[in-house]
Amino acid sequence: MALSRSTSTLSLTSFFLLLTLLSTSTLVISQPALNSAEQESVYQILESINSAIPWRSLYPDDLCISAPHGVVCDYFSENTTATIGTPHVTEMSFGYVSDYSPNPPCTPKSTINPLLFSSFPQLRKLLFYKCFTETTVTFPDFSTLRSSLEELVFIGNPSLVGSLRGNISNLTALKRLILTGNNVSGEIPDGLGDLVNLEQLSLSRNNFHGEVTLSLEKLKKLKILDLSQNGFEGSAPEPLGSLQQLLKLDLSFNNFSGKIPENLKGLKKLEFLDLSYNGFAQCGVPLFLAEMPSLREVYLSGNLLGGQIPEIWDNLGGILGIGLSEVGLVGNIPSSMGMFLRNLSYLGLDNNKLEGMVPEEFGALESVNELNLENNNLSGRVPFSAKFVSKVGGKLKLEGNPELCADEGLRSAKVSGSLGQLKLCNKPVIPHFVLLSSGSSVLHDSYMLIFVGFLFLLS
C-alpha cells in the first residue's frame, strides 16, 4: 500500500514536471524572433567595437534570447489584446566597466558606424565606456538616432571628436545626455533647450567653448547640470534660477566671468554647487547661500570674490564641504562657522588674506577630515587637541601663517600634519642678568652716579 502511494506521488510529480517543460518549450517556440535588420546591425556594431571576437559564432541564435551582456531586448505589443509582442533591441552598452557589468570589451581601434543605429526603432539606451581611445571617431549625427532614445552616454573616449550635430531636438524622450571625458568641441546647440524630458546634462571634460546661450526655461525636469572643465565663457546663464528641480550645478574650470547670478537662490533643492576656478569677481561670498538650506557642498575657489566671510551659516548646518581657497578673503574667520557647521567634512580657506585667531569652535568640528588654512595671516594659538590633530593628520594644513603657534604639549604629541612647522606658544623667556664686573664699565659708572646723587640728597 505504501509502495503504491509512493508510486502514485512520483507519477503525479513527473506529470507536472513534464507539463511545465512542455509549457516552457511552447512559450519559447511561440516567441517571435528579433527581426533580421536589427540582428544584423547588432552583429556589425559588435564587430566594429571588437573584431577579434567571433560574435556571430558565439551568439548564432536570436539575440533577444541569447546575447552578450549589455545587449537588451524588450517586447512591444501593437495592440492591447496581444499576449506576446514583437521583440526589439532597447539597450546597448559597450566597454568593460567591471565584473558586475561585463559589457562587450572595446579595443584601441574600435570604430562606429552611426547609420547602423537607424535600425533600432525602440532603442532607449546607448552607452560607450572607454571605447574610442586611439582611432579617431566622429561623434554620430543625432539624426541617425530614433526619438525613443532616453539615455545617450559617452564616457572616457579621448578619440571621440566633432560637435553635437544633427537635429538633436528630435530626441524628445531623452532623459540623460552624458558626454564626459571625450574630445567633443564646438558650442552647445540651441536644440538642447527643447528636450523637455531631460533630467541630466553632463558635458564635463571636453573642449566645448563659447557662451552658453542655451535656453533653459523649458528644462523643468533637469536635476543635474555639469558643464565643468571646458572653455565656456561670458556670464553664467541667467535662467539657471528657474531650474527648480536642480540638485547639482557644476560650472567649475571654465572662463565664466562677471558676478555670480543672484537668482541661484531660487534653487531650493540644490545640494551641490561648484563654480570654482572661473573669472567671477568682486562680488564677495554670495549672501544668498543662506537661503539655500539644502546645500551640502559649495565650492567657489579660484574666483577673485574679495570681501570678508559673511555671517550666513546658522541655516546651513547640513553642509559637508566648503571651498573658499584663493578668493581674496580678508578679515577674521567668524566663529559662527565652527558653531553651526557641525557636519563639515572639508573646509578650504587657504591662500587668502585672513587674519586673527583660528576660532576656538573649530576645535569641536568632530566630522572634519580636511582643514586647509595655509598661506594666510592667522595668528595666536591653534585650538586643536592632540586627538583632533591625530584624526585629521596630514590634511590639517596650517603652514604659511608665521604668527600661528602651537602649545608645547601639542607639538610633542606624536601626531602628523603641519604642526611641526609652527612656532611654540608661550616660549619661556630666560632673563639675562648682567653682573657687576670690571668689564661692565658703563653699568658701573651709572651705579656710581646714582650713589653720589643719593649722598648729595642726604647732605
Identify the role of each PLM range.
Residues 119-123, 142-149, 157, 169-174, ...:
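Leucine-rich repeat
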Residues 79-162:
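LRR N-terminal entry segment and analogous cap-like coil->beta motifs
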Residues 2-6, 10-77, 90-99, 130, ...:
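Surface-exposed cap/linker segments adjacent to membranes
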Residues 173-175, 181-199, 204-223, 228-247, ...:
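Tandem repeat domain/solenoid detector
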Residues 111-115, 136-143, 161-166, 185-190, ...:
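The feature encodes a structural signal of leucine-rich repeats
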Residues 267, 271, 280-283, 289-297, ...:
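Membrane-proximal ectodomain caps of single-pass cell-surface receptors
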